[in-house]
A protein has these predicted regions:
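Extracytoplasmic/periplasmic substrate-binding proteins
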Residues: 33, 223-326
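Helix-loop-helix "hinge/cap" segment bordering the ligand-binding cleft or interdomain interface
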Residues: 108-117, 126-197, 209-242, 316-322, ...
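Hinge/lid segment of periplasmic solute-binding proteins
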Residues: 6, 77, 90-146, 283-300, ...
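Conserved N-terminal structural module of periplasmic/extracytoplasmic solute-binding proteins
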Residues: 1-96, 115, 339, 412-439
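Periplasmic-binding protein-like
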Residues: 27, 151, 328-358
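Long, aromatic- and glycine/proline-rich binding clefts that accommodate carbohydrate-like moieties
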Residues: 291-294, 342-402, 406, 434-439
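Short helices/loops that flank or line small-molecule/ion binding pockets
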Residues: 66-84, 88, 101, 154, ...
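A local structural motif
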Residues: 40-61, 80, 160-166, 229-244, ...
């Protein structure tokens, strides 16, 4: 955009950052070397050069974050310099909506990062935020997914809890289904619910959801439908949905579920929290002896996939390009800072070399029974292929899962679920004209 390419006269003294929770705020305050002081209420951060960082945090629920961000970006040109958005954060599921717009700066052309600055990052994290070769965001984290399983249940069902051996039993979907039958015979569920395996299938489609105005349902998604219907009918799952209370308790001390598909943040934060008998909020410690802490391990599972991730975007019209460049350099390209974040927080960071170093070290996770899970993540991260991502992914994936839930529970036949999916997406996206199903 014209606003973006005009040279800024002088750096502004206010840096406005928009996000939906405090995750990036804490990464910034803890690891950005230019931080001088943080306000008691955390609403502002002061940098060493006197710049005031103003945080605007709007929760994600009901599209609230995107709606408020959209309104502010529409008013960006007329806003006073100190009120203009300088940096805003986006998630993978809707990244392309912003990346493919005039509101975002090219991290190389406009902001000034170089190919060599970005060379250490995982390719898929660059692909997700690129349009026609123009990279328009950058991230400090990579979020490869793995299959997290209960060691004690694996021992009972497979005779081993060793991650390399367990992987040989789960290395493709046919084998995975065989283990589901074995687990059921011992009184265990293979998965908690309908959605658990969805991303592993949807990240491995052979073509994008939408070409022109045609929606193509990939064969791999129908494999998920068939598998989930079979698991539901045979009692291999607990009919839970992602994030519901059944799903959470299935991960805890009373759970009887073999495992969960989870990415980096999910294992270190969600799964760990759910595994404890006494939550940390009630004084419980993150240690062996509290619930099933230490009884999980991870293996690659049937297919590589990713789940989640947060990208930093520079906003067109910002008068803080030098500061934005430095934030991106330090928080997404600096190998030493990336490594430190992982060592301190277990968040998996976007630097291949730093992660390889930890992968080859004696680093281990007590939560995962002493396993070095970074080694598996490092292997998985290079296999993620996001060439089929598109701007409709979030909406179509949600509608697809919702439509087929009624089929899994026996409320409708498969043909009705297909028709309901078509109706739902045409309401959501009137511009999409037809839907093609696999033969």
């Amino acid at each position: 955009s014209a606003a973006a390419s005009a040279p800024a006269a002088a750096e502004g003294k206010v840096l406005n950052i928009w996000c939906w929770n405090d995750e990036f705020q804490s990464r910034f305050n803890d690891y950005y070397p230019e931080v001088k002081e943080i306000a008691a209420d955390k609403s502002t951060t002061t940098l060493k050069d006197g710049t005031t960082v103003k945080w605007t945090i709007n929760a994600n629920e009901n599209n609230n974050y995107q709606n408020k961000l959209d309104e502010a970006l529409l008013n960006q040109d007329s806003a006073a310099d100190d009120d203009k958005i300088d940096i805003f954060l986006i998630e993978a599921d809707y990244a392309l909506k912003y990346v493919d717009s005039d509101y975002v700066l090219d991290v190389k052309k406009d902001i000034g990062l170089t190919d060599s600055d970005l060379a250490g990052q995982y390719q898929y994290t660059k692909d997700i935020v690129s349009v026609d070769g123009s990279q328009r965001g950058t991230t400090w984290q990579a979020t490869p997914g793995l299959f997290a399983y209960r060691r004690s249940i694996a021992k009972e069902v497979l005779g081993t809890d060793d991650p390399a051996e367990v992987q040989t039993y789960l290395s493709d979907w046919d084998k995975f289904n065989d283990v589901a039958a074995k687990a059921a015979a011992k009184g265990y569920k293979m998965l908690s619910g309908f959605d658990d395996a969805y991303r592993t299938f949807s990240n491995n489609v052979s073509a994008p959801w939408v070409t022109g105005t045609t929606v193509t349902v990939d064969e791999n998604l129908m494999k998920w439908v068939d598998q989930t219907k079979e698991y539901t009918d045979k009692g291999y799952n607990n009919k839970s949905s992602l994030w519901d209370s059944q799903w959470a308790s299935d991960q805890g001390p009373t759970g009887k579920v073999f495992g969960f598909f989870y990415s980096t943040w999910g294992i270190n934060f969600t799964l760990l929290g759910n595994s404890l008998a006494t939550p940390t909020a009630e004084g419980g410690k993150e240690e062996v002896g509290n619930g099933i802490y230490g009884d999980y391990a991870v293996c690659e599972g049937p297919q590589p996939y990713y789940w989640g991730g947060t990208w930093i975007c520079g906003a067109a019209g910002s008068d803080n390009l030098e500061t934005i460049k430095d934030v991106m350099l330090k928080l997404t390209c600096d190998e030493a800072i990336m490594k430190q974040i992982t060592m301190d927080t277990q968040d998996y960071t976007n630097n291949e070399k730093a992660m390889e170093e930890i992968a080859k070290s004696d680093y281990k996770s007590d939560f995962l029974g002493g396993q070095n899970h970074i080694a598996l993540f490092a292997e998985a991260a290079t296999k993620i292929d996001m060439s089929n991502a598109g701007p409709y992914d979030q909406g179509l994936n949600e509608s697809f899962q919702n439509a087929f839930k009624d089929y899994f529970t026996g409320n409708v036949e498969e043909d009705a679920a297909k028709a309901n999916f078509e109706t739902a997406i045409k309401e959501k996206y009137p511009e999409l004209t037809d839907v093609v199903w696999p033969a």
